[in-house]
Amino acid sequence: MPIRILPSDLSSQISAGEIIERPASVVKEIIENSIDAGSKNINIIVENSGFQSIILKDDGCGIDKKDLLLAVCHHATSKINSLSDLDKLTTFGFRGEALASIRAVSRLTLISCTRFNDVAAKIYLEGFCSKNIILQPIAHPEGTTIIVDNLFYNIPVRLKFLKNKKLEFSKICEVVKKIALSHFYINFSLKHNNKLITQYNSINNRKNKINRLKDIFDTLDTSEFLEIKEKKYRMVLFGWISHPYNFKKIKNIQYCYVNNRYLYNNIFVNAVRAAYSKIEQKKNISFVLYLTIESFNIDINIHPTKNEIKFHNPDVVYTFIYEAVFSYLKKIKEKYYFNFSCKKQTQLNKEKEFYFYDSDPTFLTLISSIFFKKKQIFKNIKNKIKHNNFISKSTPLEKYESSIGRLLIIIHKYYGLIYHDNNFLLLSFPVAKGIVRKQKLKNNIQKENIIEYFLSNIKINLTSQEYLILFNQKEILSKFGFHLIFKKKYVILSSIPAFLKKCNFHIIISNFFAFLFLKKQVFISDIVDWFYINVFIELKNWTYIRGIEVLLEIEYYCPLLLINPPSKLLQKININAALCILKI
């Protein structure tokens, strides 16, 4: 068969198939068009799950009658004029494909009126085969009415795959729900076969936004959710997350929005789950979160239905979401455990017997020499930065220059090439991170800011000498989050530092106590060094973003270190000597 150009009606049906998959796709596209038109009231009327007809009425700005025919053509849009406009998008639509795709697979009626028109205009089209399209005058208020009849009438194969009408209508309801969740100031109503299914009234007060959740999830108790709002890294995160210590079974509600556009994104989900895992292990985590980010930092034009986007700096986005959620969860945890500690301890779980070991010195020497090796776990370094003023809002992260200098490139995975005062320096990231970790741990201890992980009471049998060593060290251990209750011949361990939670902490605790018994007397610096060697993970692949974050952390946590940095941290590269050798 020779190569030939497809007829316009066939090519239109093929391209429409990428955008209009089912009736819910039509509803999504026309609602988004109405929102772009500034509508305050959007009414959707569906017959026979959308296969017979879908009608949308809005009170937006409307389409001028001279543009009505153009609006249903391919690549016709008022949203962008040039390629550079893609970096400034604030609207849902921009391709000019929605109405053209709907037209290709249905019988479409379009009625619209602007405030500048004396009378509305109406057109009727059947696919792209329509000829001699007549623009008819008609009475209509300002706004637009779209009537989509007999969807897929000209593609019977598609109808065979969409037999479950109940399922298709549930998809329509889900689309309306998702859009209503991000547009609080719009009234939405949905009717099916002349029956009102849902109606969401507009909410004009920010404090009452959670009422939209009540309307959409009618069985939801909103007291189970916490409102969060955070602004950082030129981004804003707003929304609700489920209470970490609410043990009722609630729906697994997970909705993510970027610039009011719904999407399911792994960065959101993973960041939220990581934050919860630091506080409380929960299977059912619910959240409705809205991320506002500058348009040039995302790419929307990567999927036909625009259900996916690409972040230009995903690590920064992940860190921001993680930090925001974790900070709120941490506050709740502190409040929860303060109230919990005031109650009688009769509600604690039954004590678990954990017999430590015999006092054989050979065994103590052996166990203290064993280091528990953990698998490398991805940790985003930015969740350690706690202050907004690290980076100026006007300075891009990649161009930020710290007191050490500006990071140019990563060399051999572990080292960074730094430029400062016409000099080139080589920085060891593992050494830098180790210094920062130790300093941060010391700072948290001094400020009594160590997060504790509460255990079911663990009973540890000890010899009299071991008991005495722990008793003498109880104050310094409590600063690290080890809460010990001393009985006559044994101790009860009720909490450990939260950073041990994901470790096999029984082994870690055994090794740590063996270390204490051998040393007999320890200082804060000794314990910090022990945790750094035995617990903390060393990154094996340093990225540019993580490198910058280490520079920022050194500048903030260890400013005096920059006056006289150790040789293992920073080495000057003699460029002049190399130039003299290479000079012709």
Curated annotation (Swiss-Prot):
Keywords: DNA damage, DNA repair. Pfam families: DNA_mis_repair, HATPase_c_3, MutL_C. InterPro entries: DNA_mismatch_repair_CS, DNA_mismatch_repair_MutL, DNA_mismatch_S5_2-like, HATPase_C_sf, MutL/Mlh/PMS, MutL/Mlh/Pms-like, MutL_C, MutL_C_dimsub. SUPFAM superfamilies: ATPase domain of HSP90 chaperone/DNA topoisomerase II/histidine kinase, DNA mismatch repair protein MutL, Ribosomal protein S5 domain 2-like. One of its GO terms (molecular function) is ATP-dependent DNA damage sensor activity. HAMAP family: DNA_mis_repair (MF_00149). NCBIfam families: mutl. Belongs to the DNA mismatch repair MutL/HexB family. This protein is involved in the repair of mismatches in DNA. It is required for dam-dependent methyl-directed DNA mismatch repair. May act as a 'molecular matchmaker', a protein that promotes the formation of a stable complex between two or more DNA-binding proteins in an ATP-dependent manner without itself being part of a final effector complex. This is DNA mismatch repair protein MutL. The gene is mutL.
